[in-house]
Structure formats: structure tokens, C-alpha cells
Amino acid sequence: MTSRIVYLGAPEGFTALAEVIAGRAKLEHVEAEPTAVAEALFDASALLDASMKVYIDDGMIAAAPDLKVISCATTGSDHIDRGEAERRGIPIHTLREDRELLQNITPAAELSWALVLAAARRLPAALAHTREGGWTRENFPGLMLHGKRLGLIGCGRIGGWMARYGQAFGMTVVGYDPFIDTWPEGIQPTGLKELFESCDVISVHVHLSDETSGLVSAPFFS
């Protein structure tokens, strides 16, 4: 019996995957929509999720008796309810397992830095102003980043890239991360309370888990 693989994600990824599989399994590109995914998983052997648009709940997994593996094109897997998968012994693979590959993948860090710049220079409000015909630049002075203090919560791969970007802009970089042993170059370790009290810009780069849920909460902003 030919194994059946369900793929969720962009057409380009499906095409590339089809070339790799080369007919050794039946590969199906399924719309990232809950009902379609649940129906497709019924007799699937594997789920390759490159969309992360659908929450894969216990019910979907329980209704897929032939499912043997789930693989995600992300470093996190909080879009999957692990309960039934763990009960069945179904492994969930993510990109976190391939550190060498991840080391030079920078889009998440680049987008994060773009958001820092957009917030510091008040770009959304300024853009809306100009689209309405305005050109009152003094209304949007923004924040000069040079000489300011950047605080990173989570100092792993993405945090390390953020530190480089901050240093390139002339910022002092401090970080909080109780889970790492080796700190990226240029980050000064500090406590979470101290980070909030001293930093002009704060950027969060941690996976959502039971340990990290609520890590950044209202009292820190008071």
C-alpha cells in the first residue's frame, strides 16, 4: 500500500517536495482550512505542515488512524495539540532539530528589526498621514536608535541576529534568557526586571510554551 502524505503550504513548496518524493508516496496538496485538513488526514501516513494556518487538534489526530509522523516547517509547534500525538507515539519534527540549517536563516530576525524601525520612526502613522495628503514631518519625530538601549528577551538564534543589528545601529544590547549557557557576542546578560526598567526598545524572541506563557505581563509596563 502506497503511503499518503498531506502537505499544507505554498504551491512552490509542494512542487519542490514532489520532486524529492518522486512518486515513492502519494502526495496531496490540501487547502489550509480545518474541515479540509481533517478530511484529508483520515487515511494519511504523514502530515507536512508548511502553513501553520490550521490548529491541528486532538480530534484531527485521533481520527487519523494511519498517521505516523508530523513535520513542520517552523521552529515552534504550538499550532499542534500534542496530547493525542504523544499518546500514539507520533513524533512531531520541527526545524529546531537542524541548528546548522537554521543558523543562517534570517527572515524572522529581519522582519523583527523592520518592526523595531517602523515603531521607532512611527512609520505606520507617518505613512497614513502622507496618504491623506499631509506632509507635517514635525508630527513624527520618532526615536533615534543610536545610543539607545536594546533589551532582548530570548537570546538564541534570532536574538543573536537582533543583537548584531542593534550594535550596527550603535545601540547597547542587553538580554534575558535563563535557558542558554553561551551568550551571543555583544549581549550583556541582565535580569528581566532590570531589562524593562532600563531599555528604550524591547524585543521578545521566545517560543510559546507552558514555561514562557505570561513571561511578559502587565506589571512590567507599570
Q: What does each model-identified segment do?
A:
Residues 166:
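Aromatic pocket-lining residues of Rossmann-like dinucleotide-binding sites
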Residues 46-127:
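Phosphate/diphosphate ligand-binding glycine-rich loop within oxidoreductases
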Residues 8, 50, 73, 205-208:
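Short, well-ordered coil/turn residues at beta-beta hairpins
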Residues 54-57, 174, 178-222:
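Rossmann-like adenosine-cofactor binding region
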Residues 15-22, 38-41, 62, 80-87, ...:
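Short loop/helix-cap segments at secondary-structure boundaries that form the rim of catalytic
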Residues 40-46, 64-68, 198-202:
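Short acidic/histidine-rich motifs immediately flanking catalytic phosphotransfer sites
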